């Protein structure tokens, strides 16, 4: 078969989803039966007489019974490239049984049919119905043989529920590289059932025994709500077996067709083992906040800034101004966004938030309705060594953004803060606490609305410990932890960004919103999970304690005892009672900081930040 034709057929199959394929095969099957009865009639009676109504009734009944039987056998009128000879036999018996049943009904009232006519109809219908299905398997076999990739690995699917059914739709893609041997489920009672023609072999508690028996090379977890401890247990079993373990993509990703066609699985990552639940967006509120507006994001090339741009883009703003100091990161984010989202005017702007005149010029030119201020220096040890840079970027830079918001009459400013701003022993946290004061101070005197959003560590960000652990594991270890007792709050980048956008939508009067980070996680436990994810053991990749670095705390806090939570505006977003200082007093302090440097500057900022945590 011509290779171009083969590729065209496979490309065509990629366009259709499961429901569309079922409709296609249903239409094709009734067409095949109509053609079969016309040809049979012509062969028996010629073209002299028009076909009586009896034959139309017979064809309709035959197709109806055929569809019922195929549906009963779970074939849904569609055959995939994994179909066995038994599936083809079911189609043959379905055509035969439906034809005989229809003949019996018609014969009881309209005895016009010949047995030879029915036999010819059955043979023709079966041939026409099976021909494209068998051709499809031959096309795929030819494609697979030509690829020679050797990736057709024996696989177990874990999950016989809705997640497993959704995965099966992706799995039956023509470019899939899986050889699905069986399905395991938490519920052992499902043993003996079938999902998409694949048998449920039992509980995944028996994974070690079943994997050895069936020579399994890969396991894919398709239970979206699986508890993190169960993920960890499955991973441990797979590691002992030397079997690769994966997961299906997120449900919305599969439903929207955003995953890579034909793969249908992803690597299990640390977020699966930490069990962070996805945040549901208040679509109507955020739509009113963002749709048709001009949005400006500072630090748009960073982890949080770029994700805010992605999340905001879902609500179809008119324009997003991507403001950042690093040209490479802004370039990458800009091209990603214009590729993923249409109808939005993305404007890449290279600017330094320490340059007030440049900021004001950008704000007045594009007239944003909302500014998300994500630009900041955030590495604690680096800022301990460079306190002047922390002051210039996190304090003066925030002041410049807030002032430009006021001057350009921007409706709202949302600043990204951190849990390190609470009782800060380090210059980075202290500068972010002063930045909070700047935002609340401007809110007192400006017609614009200001707020800050405080949260903890973000998994996978450029400043996160995760990339450090990944690099250390890739190098063979050891994985270094400053103190085995150290804990941190963690949140995923999309979750943090969604909550920031939500908090901004609730901003009214200079609030400092505090995100519910869940329970703190021991860094040592995080390191152990990372080693497990890599497929190694602690004996292979040791974890060592190296001591706390300057400016670090054993335990982070989201608020101090005096910052009692005032109220909860929505799930996982609280409003803290934080101290507010007149902008004039803040200006005076900033003036004092300007003339200091080194340790003097560091001590002055830390002392001032800690003084401001008490409610007056």
Feature locations, PLM:
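Signature of alpha-helical transmembrane segments in polytopic membrane proteins
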Residues: 1-150, 240, 247, 371
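Flexible, Lys/Arg-rich cytosolic regulatory linkers and terminal tails that connect or flank
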Residues: 2-7, 11, 231-294, 406
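Strand-loop microenvironment adjacent to phosphate/nucleotide-handling motifs in alpha/beta enzyme folds
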Residues: 21, 280, 285-289, 441-458, ...
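A solvent-exposed beta-alpha-beta segment
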Residues: 45-49, 139-255, 328-332, 339, ...
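Proline-aspartate-enriched helix->loop->beta-strand connector
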Residues: 211, 215-217, 317-318, 363, ...
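Conserved Rossmann-fold NAD(P)-dependent oxidoreductase catalytic core, especially the SDR/UDP-sugar
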Residues: 241, 256-257, 373, 377-436, ...
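N-terminal Rossmann/SDR dinucleotide-binding element
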Residues: 258-271, 275-367
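Hydrophobic/aromatic anchor residues within beta-strands of the central parallel beta-sheet
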Residues: 348, 390, 450-453
């Amino acid at each position: 078969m011509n290779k171009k034709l083969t590729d065209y057929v496979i490309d065509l199959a990629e366009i259709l989803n499961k429901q569309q394929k079922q409709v296609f095969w249903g239409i094709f099957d009734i067409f095949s039966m109509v053609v079969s009865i016309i040809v049979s009639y012509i062969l028996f009676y010629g073209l002299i007489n028009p076909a009586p109504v009896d034959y139309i009734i017979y064809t309709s009944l035959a197709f109806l019974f055929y569809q019922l039987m195929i549906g009963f056998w779970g074939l849904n009128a569609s055959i995939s490239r994994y179909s066995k000879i038994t599936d083809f036999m079911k189609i043959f018996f379905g055509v035969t049984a439906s034809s005989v049943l229809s003949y019996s009904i018609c014969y009881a009232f309209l005895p016009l049919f010949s047995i030879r006519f029915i036999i010819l109809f059955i043979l023709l219908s079966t041939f026409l119905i099976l021909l494209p299905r068998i051709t499809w398997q031959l096309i795929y076999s030819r494609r697979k043989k030509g690829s020679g990739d050797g990736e057709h690995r024996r696989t177990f699917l874990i999950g016989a529920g809705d997640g497993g059914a959704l995965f099966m739709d992706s799995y039956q893609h023509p470019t899939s590289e899986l050889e699905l041997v069986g399905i395991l489920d938490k519920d052992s009672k499902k043993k003996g059932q079938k999902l998409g023609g694949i048998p449920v072999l039992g509980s995944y508690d028996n994974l070690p025994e079943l994997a050895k028996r069936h020579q399994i090379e890969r396991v894919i977890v398709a239970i979206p709500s699986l508890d993190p401890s169960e993920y960890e247990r499955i991973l441990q079993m797979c590691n002992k077996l030397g079997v690769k373990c994966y997961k299906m993509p997120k449900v919305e990703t599969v439903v929207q067709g955003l995953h890579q066609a034909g793969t249908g699985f992803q690597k299990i990552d640390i977020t699966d083992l930490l069990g962070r639940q996805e945040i549901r967006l208040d679509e109507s509120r955020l739509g009113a906040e963002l749709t048709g507006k001009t949005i400006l994001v500072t630090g748009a090339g960073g982890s949080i800034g770029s994700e805010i741009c992605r999340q905001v883009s879902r609500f179809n703003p008119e324009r997003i101004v991507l403001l950042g100091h690093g040209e490479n990161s802004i370039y990458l984010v800009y091209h990603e966004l214009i590729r993923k989202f249409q109808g939005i005017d993305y404007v890449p702007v290279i600017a330094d938030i320490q340059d007030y005149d440049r900021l004001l010029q950008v704000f007045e030119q594009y007239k944003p309705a909302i500014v998300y201020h994500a630009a900041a220096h955030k590495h604690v040890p680096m800022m301990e060594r460079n306190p002047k840079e922390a002051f210039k970027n996190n304090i003066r830079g925030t002041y410049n953004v807030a002032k430009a918001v006021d001057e350009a009459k921007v409706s709202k400013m949302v600043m990204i803060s951190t849990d390190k701003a609470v009782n800060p022993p380090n210059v980075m946290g202290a500068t972010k606490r002063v930045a909070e004061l700047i935002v609340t101070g401007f809110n007192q005197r400006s017609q614009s609305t200001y707020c800050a959003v405080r949260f903890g560590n973000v998994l996978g960000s450029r400043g996160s410990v995760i990339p450090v652990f990944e690099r250390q594991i890739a190098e063979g270890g050891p994985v270094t932890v400053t103190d085995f007792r150290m804990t941190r709050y963690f949140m995923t980048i999309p979750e943090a960004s969604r909550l920031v956008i939500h908090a901004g939508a609730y901003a009214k009067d200079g609030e400092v919103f505090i995100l519910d980070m869940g329970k703190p996680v021991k860094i040592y436990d995080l390191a152990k999970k990372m080693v497990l994810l890599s497929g190694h053991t602690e004996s292979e990749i040791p974890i060592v304690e190296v001591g706390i670095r300057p400016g670090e705390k054993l335990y982070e806090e989201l608020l101090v005892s005096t910052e009692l939570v005032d109220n909860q505006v929505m799930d996982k977003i609280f409003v803290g009672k934080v101290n507010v200082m007149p902008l004039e007093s803040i200006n005076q302090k900033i003036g004092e900081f300007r003339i200091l440097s080194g340790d003097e500057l560091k001590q002055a900022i830390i002392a001032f930040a800690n003084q401001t945590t008490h409610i007056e």
